[in-house]
Swiss-Prot record:
Bias-annotated ranges (Low complexity): 275-287
One GO CC annotation: nucleus
Organism: Mus musculus
Primary localization: nucleus
Function per UniProt: May act as a specific coactivator for the mammalian TEFs.
InterPro entries recorded: TDU_repeat (IPR006627), VGLL4 (IPR028184)
Subcellular location: Nucleus
Gene Ontology BP annotations: negative regulation of cardiac muscle cell proliferation; negative regulation of cell growth; negative regulation of DNA-templated transcription; negative regulation of hippo signaling; negative regulation of Wnt signaling pathway; positive regulation of protein catabolic process
Similarity-based family: Belongs to the vestigial family.
Lineage of the species this protein comes from: Eukaryota, Metazoa, Chordata, Craniata, Vertebrata
Stretches the record annotates as Disordered: 44-68, 251-287
Alphabetically ordered keywords of this record: Nucleus, Phosphoprotein, Transcription, Transcription regulation
Superkingdom of origin organism: Eukaryota
Protein name: Transcription cofactor vestigial-like protein 4
Modified residues (Phosphoserine): S58, S271
Length: 287
């Protein structure tokens, strides 16, 4: 019983000493700022109001009498009292009507500014501010990767804007964009051309876009140098490919086609050899 009384007296003595030190610290700050000493009374009352509940059990008997739940509750109460001491100047400013923002508060994000009053208002429980933080909207800030890209790259990623891609990114060998390989041309030029490239292929979707955009100024794509032209007749094609052989085949075919016609005019049936000759030349024509 004597030890209990001594522990209680020791606790009360330490409590008074802490309160006196806190009051002296606040009075010293008030004197440095030139404020009256009466403003420290609400702070002292606020500090004393947070000390609620019976005094803790003596350290010599704590390990025998306290349960794990009581220990957690005691630690939580100590944490809440420390947080209330930290945020008590902010509460004092709002009570006195001083709502001016601190320069450090201006640099905070909206979520951090919302977290500070939430922690001070919910002094009964430290984690009461977590739901309010979850309900706050996200900060609408620009992504850091967007700052490294140029304005042309950001504009090309917009689907509503039709722009000209760079020369290395184009997959068509003919582009009619004003921004060509040699730079920008005048806006009033009649047509847009660029030299053909044998390595790239032409995209029909891109060509259709330029055909509709340029109208009469649009020029058809020029064929590649190694491409085969399909202009001219079939006879010219085989004459260039086969030479004299094609002329012989064509002469034999003409003679074979004329002999059945002459025989039918005389009323005589056509000889089977003529049909054989005409059929024998047909595979060579196909080849």
């Amino acid at each position: 019983m004597l030890f209990m009384k001594m522990d209680l007296l020791n606790y009360q003595y330490l409590d008074k000493m802490n309160n006196n030190i806190g009051v002296l610290c606040y009075e010293g700050e008030a004197s440095l700022r030139g404020e009256p000493r009466m403003q420290t009374l609400p702070v002292a009352s606020a500090l004393s109001s947070h000390r609620t509940g019976p005094p803790p059990i003596s350290p010599s008997k704590r390990k025998f009498s306290m349960e794990p739940g009581d220990k957690d509750l005691d630690c939580e109460n100590d944490h809440v009292s420390k947080m209330s001491r930290i945020f008590s100047p902010h509460l004092n400013k709002t009570v006195n009507g001083d709502c001016r923002r601190d320069p450090r508060e201006r640099s905070r994000s909206p979520i951090e500014r919302a977290a500070a009053p939430a922690v001070s208002l919910h002094g009964g429980h430290l984690y009461a501010s977590l739901p309010s933080l979850m309900e706050q909207p996200l900060a609408l800030t620009k992504n850091s990767s967007d700052t490294g890209r140029s304005a042309v790259e950001r504009q090309q990623n917009r689907p509503s804007v039709i722009t000209c891609a760079s020369a290395g990114a184009r997959n068509c060998n003919l582009s009619h964009c004003p921004i060509a390989h040699s730079g920008c041309s005048a806006p009033g030029s009649a047509s847009y051309r660029r030299p053909p490239s044998a390595t790239a292929t032409c995209d029909p979707v891109v060509e259709e876009h330029f055909r509709r955009s340029l109208g009469k100024n649009y020029k058809e794509p020029e064929p590649a140098p190694n491409s085969v032209s399909i202009t001219g007749s079939v006879d010219d094609h085989f004459a260039k490919a086969l030479g004299d052989t094609w002329l012989q085949i064509k002469a034999a075919k003409d003679s074979a086609s004329s002999s059945p016609e002459s025989a039918s005019r005389r009323g005589q049936p056509a000889s089977p050899t003529a049909h054989m000759v005409s059929h024998s030349h047909s595979p060579s024509v196909v080849s």
